[in-house]
C-alpha cells in the first residue's frame, strides 16, 4: 500500500487534471442506457450531482468567480490578482452508515482539482465490487469524453484500510493536505487524533440527527395532511434512516385541527403504500421490540407497526425528542410552542424538515438556527444532499489562494 500511495501522491498531475469545463459536463460521460443501469444498481442519487447545472450552481455558491480555479484573475481591487490552487491531496474517510454519500465530497475534491484518496474499510470492499461490476457491464462512454474520464480516474485512488490498522491510517493521514471525515462520534475522534501536517485542513461531518416540524397553520384539511404524509415518507424511507438528514421525530405544533391519532393513521397509510426493498437488521429489530415493549407500558403512548416491524410510528403524548431507533421508525409528539421545541433540541441537530407557511419560515429559521441547526429543507426534500452541508461550503477549504 505504501509504495502505491506514495507513487500516486508524487504524480505530476497538472496536465492530468480535468478543466472545469470538462468536469461540469461529466454527466455526459454516461450514455442513456448506462445511466439507467447506474441509477438502478448503485448510485442513483449521485447522478443529479454530476449534471452540469448542479456543478455550476455549487461552484457559484462556493466562489465569487469560480473561473479562478483555472486561471488567475483580477479581484475587486485592480492591484490584486488571485489564483485558486488545489491544496494537494484530499483524503476522504468513508462513512460507515451510508458510504456512498462520501462520493459527494469526492466530486467536490475533483472540482477543486485535488488528487483524491478514498479510504474504504474492508467491510465495504464488496460494495465497490458491485459498483465497478455495474460500471463494467453498463458504462458506455462517448468517445469524445475518453480523455476527460481518464483524467478523472487518474485523480482518484482507492485504498482499503481497516479500523484497527493504525499504522496504515496514520500514513494516509500524515501525507494528506485535506482530510474529509464522515462518521460517528468514535470514528471522528479517532481519525481526528491521527498525526497530520500542521497546515492540513479538516472538513468534519460528524454525528448528527434530524427531525421534522409541522405548524398548526399549515394543515387545514385532511387533503393537506395526506399531501404532507406522502412527502414525509420519502424522507423517512431514504437509506432506511441511516443518513444524518433522515427525520426520526415528527413534532406537530399544538393547536392543529387534527389529533395526533388522526395524523399517525394517515402517515401509516402512506407508509403502507411504500414498497420496502431492504430487510430489517436483526439488531435493529431487537431494539424495536424493546422500544415497543417499553412504550406499551405507558398508557398514554400508542404504537402503529407494520408486519415484522418494517416501519413503526410511536405516538407520544408527552412532548419529548427521542433517540433514533432507525428502520423507518418515527416518534410523533406535539410541542406547545416553538420555544418548547428550542429547549428540547439536541445539540447535534443537523436538519429540521419544515412543513410551514412561507410567511412563518423566516421567524422559525431564525429561532431554531440559534440552537445550532444548519439546514431547514422542505418536507420531502430532506434527503437531498446540497451545499452548504453541516454549515460548510467544503470547497472553500479544498483550495489555497495565490495572490500577486
Feature map (PLM): residue ranges:
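Generic structural signal for well-ordered, non-membrane alpha-helical segments
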Residues: 1, 12, 16-19, 23, ...
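N-terminal Rossmann-like NAD(P)+-binding subdomain of aldehyde/semialdehyde dehydrogenases
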Residues: 1-88, 353, 359-360, 377
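Structural signal for hydrophobic packing residues in well-ordered secondary-structure cores
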Residues: 12, 27-30, 136-139, 143, ...
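Rossmann-like NAD(P) dinucleotide-binding subdomain of oxidoreductase/dehydrogenase enzymes
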Residues: 72-237
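Amphipathic coiled-coil/heptad-repeat helices and related helical stalk/stem segments
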Residues: 102, 164-165, 337-338, 360-361
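Short beta-alpha junction loops
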Residues: 121-126, 356-359, 383
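Residues that line or immediately flank small-molecule/substrate-binding pockets and catalytic motifs
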Residues: 183, 356, 380
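NAD(P)-dependent aldehyde/semialdehyde dehydrogenase
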Residues: 230, 238-353, 362-404
Amino acid at each position: 500500500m505504501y509504495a502505491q500511495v506514495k507513487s500516486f501522491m508524487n504524480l505530476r498531475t497538472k496536465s492530468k487534471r480535468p478543466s472545469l469545463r470538462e468536469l461540469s459536463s461529466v454527466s455526459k460521460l454516461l450514455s442513456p442506457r448506462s445511466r439507467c443501469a447506474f441509477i438502478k444498481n448503485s448510485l442513483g442519487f449521485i447522478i443529479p450531482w454530476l449534471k452540469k447545472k448542479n456543478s455550476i450552481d455549487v461552484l457559484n455558491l462556493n466562489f465569487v468567480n469560480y473561473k479562478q480555479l483555472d486561471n488567475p484573475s483580477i479581484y475587486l481591487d485592480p492591484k490584486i490578482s488571485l489564483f485558486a490552487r488545489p491544496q494537494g491531496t484530499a483524503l476522504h474517510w468513508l462513512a460507515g452508515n451510508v458510504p456512498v454519500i462520501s462520493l459527494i465530497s469526492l466530486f467536490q475534491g475533483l472540482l477543486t482539482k485535488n488528487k483524491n484518496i478514498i479510504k474504504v474499510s474492508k467491510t465495504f470492499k464488496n460494495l465497490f465490487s458491485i459498483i465497478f461490476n455495474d460500471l463494467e457491464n453498463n458504462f458506455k462512454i462517448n468517445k469524445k469524453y475518453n480523455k476527460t474520464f481518464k483524467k478523472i480516474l487518474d485523480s482518484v485512488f482507492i485504498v482499503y484500510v481497516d479500523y484497527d490498522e493504525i499504522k496504515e491510517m496514520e500514513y494516509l493521514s500524515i501525507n494528506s493536505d485535506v482530510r474529509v471525515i464522515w462518521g460517528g462520534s468514535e470514528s471522528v475522534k479517532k481519525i481526528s487524533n491521527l498525526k497530520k501536517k500542521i497546515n492540513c485542513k479538516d472538513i468534519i461531518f460528524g454525528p448528527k440527527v434530524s427531525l421534522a416540524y409541522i405548524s398548526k397553520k399549515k394543515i387545514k384539511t385532511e387533503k393537506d395532511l395526506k399531501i404532507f404524509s406522502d412527502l414525509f415518507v420519502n424522507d423517512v424511507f431514504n437509506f432506511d434512516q441511516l443518513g444524518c438528514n433522515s427525520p426520526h421525530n415528527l413534532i406537530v405544533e399544538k393547536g392543529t385541527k387534527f389529533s395526533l391519532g388522526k395524523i399517525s393513521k394517515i402517515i401509516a397509510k402512506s407508509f403502507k403504500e411504500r414498497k420496502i426493498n431492504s430487510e430489517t437488521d436483526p439488531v435493529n429489530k431487537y431494539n424495536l421490540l424493546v422500544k415497543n415493549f417499553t412504550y406499551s407500558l405507558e398508557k398514554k403512548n400508542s404504537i402503529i407497526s407494520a408486519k415484522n416491524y418494517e416501519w413503526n410510528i410511536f405516538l407520544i403524548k408527552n412532548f419529548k425528542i427521542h433517540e433514533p431507533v432507525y428502520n423507518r421508525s418515527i416518534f410523533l409528539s406535539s410541542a406547545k410552542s416553538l420555544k418548547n421545541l428550542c429547549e428540547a433540541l439536541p445539540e447535534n441537530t443537523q436538519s429540521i424538515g419544515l412543513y410551514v407557511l412561507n410567511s412563518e419560515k423566516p421567524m422559525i429559521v431564525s429561532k431554531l438556527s440559534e440552537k445550532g441547526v444548519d439546514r431547514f429543507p422542505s418536507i420531502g426534500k430532506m434527503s437531498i444532499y446540497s451545499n452548504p452541508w453541516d454549515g460548510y461550503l467544503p470547497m472553500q477549504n479544498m483550495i489555497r489562494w495565490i495572490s500577486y
